[in-house]
Amino acid sequence: MTPKLVVFDLDFTLWDAAGTWCDHLNPPFEIVSGRIFDSMRAELKLYPGTIDILEELKHECIDIGIASRTGEPEWAKELLNLLNVREYFRYEEIYPGSKITHFKRLRNKSGLNYEDMIFFDDEPRNITEVSELGVKCILVKKGISPEVVRSYLTSR
C-alpha cells in the first residue's frame, strides 16, 4: 500500500551537516556560491537525490513530514529555508524529545493512522520505538537515496 505520509529525520537522513548534527554547527549560516556554510566553514548539504525524492512525493500527492529531535529547532528551520526545501513539508515536528511524541502529534495533525505512515531515520533507537506505534520504519545508514525511498513506496 502506498503511504499517505512520508516522514524524514534530518541529520544523517536528509542532510549531512559536515559529519555531525545540525545543532553542533556554528551559526550564523551563509550561502557562498550556492553552498551553505556555518561560521567555521563547515558545509551542510542535502544527500544526492533528496530534491528528486521530494519532487516525486509532491507529484504523487503524498504528504511529507519531518520528525527531528534536534536541540536547536530554529537552526534546523533556518537550514531548511536556506536549502529551499521547507516548502515540501506539510508537517514539521522539530524539537528535542522522543520521536513517539513527534508521531503522536503527526497523527493528530494529519488525521492519519500510523499504518498510513512511513518513516526514514538513521538511528536504530528511533526506528525501534516508532515502529512499535505501527509506523513502517526504514533505517538508513548514510542518508536517503532515491532508490531506497522508491523501493518502499512501491512495495506492497
Where are the language model's segments positioned?
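Short, acidic loop-to-helix structural element flanking the phosphoryl-transfer center
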Residues: R35-G65, E74-K77, G97-T101
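Short beta->alpha linker loops
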Residues: G49, T70-G71, G97-S98, D122, ...
